[in-house]
Amino acid sequence: MIILGSAGILLMCYHGYSPIDDVINTLTGIAAECICLFPCYNGRYDVVGTFQIPMEISSWIHNISAIFFFGLLAYNVLFLFTKSGAIVTPNKKKRNIIFRVCGIGMVVSLLAIVLVSIFNVWAGTWLVEAVALFFFGIAFLTKADVYPWLFCDPKEEK
């Protein structure tokens, strides 16, 4: 929860390239904080969380927040990370392929979470969430040019 809560704060504070980046990242951060504040169903307690609300309500808020969180991350990867300027370099095209693969992987992971929930496989949810976060991590590191030897455009000298 500490890592997710910290990531939520980071997302809410992050200023992107355009206003839509700010809106999407702020909403994603709020969803992350709600995931932390409202525990999911565990069957042990009647009231839970910081606000001591009934388990069923907390679980609904948690699940809806998780859907928004993962959905907005996927939107970020598929539509915001792939935005380009006037000139699309060959390396930007390669990065966009990575973003699309990761975004599609996240969407498939979200669909898998629905299937896991329908068939009530509790441990499967954690695994599929981890896969979705892995895809986002790859896309985020690619967007951040962490791999300068891999698909990065040369920096313009000023």
What are these regions (language model features)?
Residues 9, 70-78, 98-116:
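Hydrophobic core of alpha-helical transmembrane segments in multi-pass integral membrane proteins
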Residues 1-4, 59-70, 96-103, 126-133:
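Alpha-helical transmembrane segments of polytopic membrane proteins
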Residues 19, 55-63, 118-127:
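Membrane-helix interface and helix-disruption motif detector
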Residues 28-98:
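Membrane-proximal helix-loop-helix units in multi-pass membrane proteins
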Residues 12-16, 36-43, 74-84, 114-121, ...:
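Transmembrane helix-loop junctions and nearby membrane-interface residues
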Residues 106-158:
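C-terminal transmembrane-bundle signature of multipass membrane proteins
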Residues 1-10, 67-78, 132-143:
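Hydrophobic cores of alpha-helical transmembrane segments in multi-pass inner/ER membrane proteins
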Residues 1-36, 40:
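Early transmembrane hairpin module of multi-pass membrane proteins
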